[in-house]
C-alpha cells in the first residue's frame, strides 16, 4: 500500500507507508491443480485470437461501516468520479492477454481451513481436514470480497472425495482486474492528515500478474478546497499503478517475455530487476527502463538503470525524486499541475512482462531533460551546474514556470534543493492571485492563464538619481520569481508582457529590459514554448485566442421533479453533480471546465478553457463534440430523490478581437445546430433517454 501526500505547505513531510503496508497484505495466487479449465486456458499459449487487449478494470464500491453521522457524501462523490476517470485512462494505456471466461479470485486456505492432512503418503496430503469455524469470507485491505467473485472450497477426508462446502461463484465477466473501492476515515487517514488515498494489490494470477486490489480514500480529506478533481485523479492513478505492478513487493515477480505477450512459452521470471551501482544507489535495471532514462537524459546508448528512492529500504516502490522530479511514481505529490505520466514509468510496465504499453500516452517530463548522466547526483546538485537545482533559501520559479517557488529541500532530496511552489497564491496562471492596483504592483506582475514565472527584479518605483545604469542600480533587489504574460512566436521563442508595457521579445538564456521599469527580466532557456505549435494566445485585455484555444461558456437548462425547489447549498451540490456528468460525457479531464454555477431558475453554466498542463483535445474540438452529443442525448443526473434532465444547451465563444470571425463562427454554428436538430428529431421521438449516474460500474 502506498500513501501519497498532498503537499499543502510546499514541503514533503513524513514517510511513505507503501512498503510496510503492502508487505502486510497476503498475496494470493491460485494453485494450478485447483484452477478451473477456463482459467488455465487463459494462461497457456493459444492461437492468435488471444492477442493483448485493453486492460478491463471492473470496480466495486462498498461503503465502509461507519456511524451515519460520519458518512461523507461529498468525499464519496469525488472519489467515485476520480476512479471512473482513472480506470478509463488506464484502459487506454495498458493491454493484457484477456482472461477467458469469468474472473474468479482465490480463497485463502489459511483463513477457511484450521488444519490439513499431514501424511505425505495419503492422497489428500495438504488438503483441508478441519474447517475454521470463525471463517467469515475473504477481504482485500479491509474491503469484503463478495462470494460471487470467489472460488469455492471443500472439506477433504483422509481418503476419498471431498465434501463441497461452498461452490464457485459465477465470477466477473469481461474483467482482467478487480478494483475494490472504499471511502472511509481509517486509522491511517487519522494519523496522516495529508493522505488522499492508499492502495494495495491482493491477488495474482498463475504468472503473478495482479488480478485484484483495493483503494481506500480518506473521505474527510477529500473535502479540502485546495484539492481539485485532477489532484484526486492523479493520486488515484499513482495508487493504481502501485496495485498493478509498480511495487517493491512485485518487482521480483516481473517476467521476461522476449517474444511478446502472446508467446507465453518463451516467458520466464526476470533474473535481476534491481541492483546497486558503484555508488551504492539502488537501481531498477530492466532494459526498457534503462533505455528510456538514457533517452530522457540525452545519453547515447543505455544506462545501468533508473535510481529508486531508498528512504524506506531496499523494497522501494518509487523513483528517486532528485532524478525524476514530477514523475507520477515519485514518493511525493506536488499536485496534478506538476505531475506527469512519464515515459520511464511506462517503460517499467513494459518490462513487467504482464502488459503491452501504449507509449504514445506518455507525457513529456521536463525535469532533467537532456542533462546528461551525472544529473541528479548528490555530488553535483549543489555545485550550480544545473539550474534545475538551487542553493540557499531564496524565492524563484518552479521549474515548470507555472508557479513562484521557494528554494527548499526534504528528506527524499538528500540535501539537494529545488524551487517548490509556495503554500498559497503562487500560481501565475490564476487571475485571482493578482494585485488590484498599480500602486500595489510596483513589479508590474500580471496573473493570467497565459502568465508564467520569470526571474526578474523589475520595479516602476523611482530609484537613486545618481545611477546612470538603471538595470544595474544598487537600489535594485536581487532577482526573484514574478508573474508575467508570455506568448509563443515559434518553437523555443516567445515574447513577454509586463503591466503597461508592449510585447517584448524574450531571447531564451538572455535578460531583457522593459520600457517604464528599472531592472531586468531573465528569459528561461529550454522551459517554455518547447513545441512547434505556432503563436499561442496570451495577450492583454481584450483577450484573444487561437481557434484551437477558444474561451467558451456552456449553458444548460435543467428540468426536474415538479415542485422540487433547491436552496443555495443544494444548487452548489447539483452543479458539482452536473459537472461530473459533463466531464464523463466529454471523456476528458476536468481541467477544461471552470466555475460551475446553477441559478434559481435551474440554468447550469460553466466556463471552458484549458488549464496549464491540461492534456487532451483543443477546446474547439471539445466544443464541437459537446454541441453534437448534448443535442442527441441530454444529460440526466440524480440529486437526492430528484432527477434532472438537460432541456437545451448553448455554447458561447468569446472572440472579441475579431468581430467578423465571431459572426462567421456563430453563423456556422447556428446552421450546424439546425442541421443536427432536423436530423435528430425523428430519432429523438423513439429514443429512450439513458440514465447517467455518476459512479463506477458495479457489475
Swiss-Prot record:
GO biological process, one term: cell adhesion
Active site residues according to the UniProt entry: 239
Broad class of the protein's primary localization: membrane
Organism field: Mus musculus
Tissues where the protein occurs: Specifically expressed in ciliated left-right organizer.
Regions crossing the membrane: 664-684
Taxonomic placement: Eukaryota, Metazoa, Chordata, Craniata, Vertebrata
Cofactor binding description: Binds 1 zinc ion per subunit.
Subcellular location per the Swiss-Prot or TrEMBL entry: Membrane
Family to which the UniProt record says this protein belongs: Belongs to the peptidase M8 family.
The gene coding this protein: Cirop
Binding-site residues for Zn(2+), renumbered to this chain: 238, 242, 318
UniProt-recorded name of the protein: Ciliated left-right organizer metallopeptidase
UniProt xrefs under InterPro entries: Peptidase_M8
Pfam family, one: Peptidase_M8
Record carries keyword NAD: no
Enzyme class, first EC level, given as a word: hydrolase
